[in-house]
Each structure stands twice: as C-alpha cells, then as structure tokens.
Amino acid sequence: MAETPTVKLKGKDRIVVWPAYFDADRSRSEGRKVPKRLAVRNPRLTELRHIAEKLGLNPKVQRDKRYPKRWWDDKGRLIVDKVESKRKTLLMIAEKLKERRES
C-alpha cells in the first residue's frame, strides 16, 4: 500500500472530503452533507478522486484515515484545493458523482 501523503491543513486553502458526505444511506446527523437528491449509495474514494481531478481540485488521497463518526469504517478521505466554500465544493462534487452514477 502506498504511503499516505503528508498534507498541511492549517491554512484555509484545502478542504477535507469524506465519502460519508455523499452517502445516501446516512442521515445528516450521521455525516451526510449533501442533499438526498444528490447523494449516492456507497460512494467510493476512487470515484471521488477521479471527479476531483476532473474539476481541477488537485486531490490527495489518504486511504488510512477514518471518518470520526464511524471510526471502524476505513474508507479514507480526500484533501482538495479550496476554490469555493466547502459547501459549494461538495455540491460540485456531488453533482458530478450523481451524473457519473446515472450514466
């Protein structure tokens, strides 16, 4: 397994993106951050990375990270460039993810 890249998050120019943010099976209190209409079942880190690359967000994959609300679930996370607010960035990714799943 590849080593997790070290990414500095102290500045306001990067955003953490967890697959849980896009999971249709989760409620808002369980970590979903996008509207149900844009959420998908079982979002994968590889899908999110591919979409973030297409959007020019310079994604960094960290596979060994665990979403704090579900620490037993080792799906990893992405670190992406902040080009808009976190909410707008997540909505952009969610729209592309939904399109990709429906095609």
UniProtKB/Swiss-Prot annotation:
SUPFAM superfamilies: SRP19 (SSF69695)
Compartment(s) of residence: Cytoplasm
Domain of life: Archaea
Transmembrane segments: none
GO cellular component: signal recognition particle
Signal peptide: none
Assembly notes: Part of the signal recognition particle protein translocation system, which is composed of SRP and FtsY. Archaeal SRP consists of a 7S RNA molecule of 300 nucleotides and two protein subunits: SRP54 and SRP19.
Role summary: Involved in targeting and insertion of nascent membrane proteins into the cytoplasmic membrane. Binds directly to 7S RNA and mediates binding of the 54 kDa subunit of the SRP.
Protein name (database record): Signal recognition particle 19 kDa protein
The encoding gene: srp19
